[in-house]
């Protein structure tokens, strides 16, 4: 019997709509983002998914997406676990910058490397930057040494994996059906891990907002199959839109 896991990237955020790098900045959803989250819930309901537990990050765009989706699923009562380890990749000094302006300044190739490569970090924020996570009380209990000032996708995977191993994998091994509402890069990290994707191929993997990605896993948590729910062509178009965000006009 296969285990079921759904990865759900949050709906469109206010900075997604403005084409800005977001990272750990706590930006809310647009109205379209709420609608995407609700539609995701309907798609999961149509699939007949009955979850046992849900996980999300400490950022409200993922939290609110989960809330909207669970309401549409009529599964608001589910236990929800939140962890900083599911936060978006920290984009360092790029956070808040317009992606098109950044591509015009540094070149599309460089921006694409910063956005989609596996092991290259963007420039870091300074320790005295007001947006440094150590100044955010939601991270007050964490050792400052673990708080990032920039991250590559590799760093993000190294951050996410302990939570996968300690919290999520044991639930799947207990035959629970699990929903994760998180972010483009924390989910790309899990996608890479689950599919054993190469460092080169992950460059071209783009996860669209608000479309559930259903994995069926074996009893050893190996991938049996995975697919986006709903219209596959719509998911492909949405992924292409994500890929084009870092291109100069």
Swiss-Prot record:
GO terms for molecular function: phosphoglycerate mutase activity. It is an enzyme of class 5 (isomerase). Its EC number is 5.4.2.11. The active site is at 10 (tele-phosphohistidine intermediate), 88 (proton donor/acceptor). GO terms for biological process: gluconeogenesis; glycolytic process. It comes from the Bacteria. The record marks 183 as: Transition state stabilizer. Belongs to the phosphoglycerate mutase family. BPG-dependent PGAM subfamily. Homodimer. NCBIfam families: pgm_1, PRK14115.1. This is 2,3-bisphosphoglycerate-dependent phosphoglycerate mutase. It comes from Xylella fastidiosa (strain M12). The lineage of its organism: Bacteria, Pseudomonadati, Pseudomonadota, Gammaproteobacteria, Lysobacterales. The gene is gpmA.
């Amino acid at each position: 019997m296969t285990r079921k896991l759904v990865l759900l990237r949050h709906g469109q955020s206010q900075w997604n709509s403005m084409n800005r790098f977001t990272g750990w900045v706590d930006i809310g959803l647009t109205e379209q983002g709420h609608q995407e989250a609700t539609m995701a819930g309907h798609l999961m309901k149509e699939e007949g998914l009955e979850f046992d537990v849900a996980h999300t990050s400490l950022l409200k765009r993922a939290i609110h997406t989960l809330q909207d989706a669970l309401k549409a699923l009529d599964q608001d009562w589910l236990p929800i676990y939140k962890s900083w380890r599911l936060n978006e990749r920290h984009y360092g000094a790029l956070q808040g910058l317009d992606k098109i302006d950044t591509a015009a300044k540094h070149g599309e190739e460089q921006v694409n490397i910063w956005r989609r490569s596996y092991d290259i970090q963007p420039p870091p924020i300074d320790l005295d930057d007001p947006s440094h996570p150590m100044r955010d009380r939601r991270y007050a209990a964490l050792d400052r040494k673990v708080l990032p000032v920039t991250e590559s996708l590799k760093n993000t995977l190294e951050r996410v994996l302990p939570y996968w191993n300690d919290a999520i994998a044991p639930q799947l091994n207990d035959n629970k059906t699990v929903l994760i509402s998180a972010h483009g890069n924390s989910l790309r990290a899990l996608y890479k891990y689950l599919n054993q994707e190469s460092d080169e191929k992950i460059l071209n993997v783009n996860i669209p907002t608000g479309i559930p990605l259903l994995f069926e896993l074996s009893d050893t948590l190996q991938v049996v199959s995975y697919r986006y729910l709903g219209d596959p062509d719509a998911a492909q178009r949405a992924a292409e839109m994500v890929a084009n965000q870092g291109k100069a006009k």
